């Protein structure tokens, strides 16, 4: 930590022309406020969502549901992803838990749709990758 603090002090010295202990304390307080504003619970929740997408099967399911713009039956999703029924069920459970898909029973069929959160994330991701 001492090495990091010294480097931080050198950075402030370069930025301010002269760095005093008060400058270091003030900037550390400002950075602490930024960190506190994030909130541990919020960061954990966001990481849970990203973790749910960090699997090819789950991400493919989300992409298909977003592209479909309608509910799809589990049997339709199973035709798209190359996993066992158990694997599909596990993936869908993780996506429901992360708030990326909603499921409902329709008679003897289980149907799923993408949530607004899933649509927003896929939209952002599509815009972050170029086709080049």
What is the predicted role of each segment?
Residues 92-93:
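Short, hydrophobic-biased segments on the C-terminal half of alpha helices
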Residues 69-70, 96, 126:
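Residue-level detector of secondary-structure transition/capping positions
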Residues 79, 96-97:
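Alpha-helical residues within the helix-turn-helix
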Residues 40-84, 110-112:
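N-terminal helix-turn-helix DNA-binding core of bacterial DNA-binding proteins
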Residues 111-132:
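Conserved segment of winged-helix/HTH DNA-binding domains
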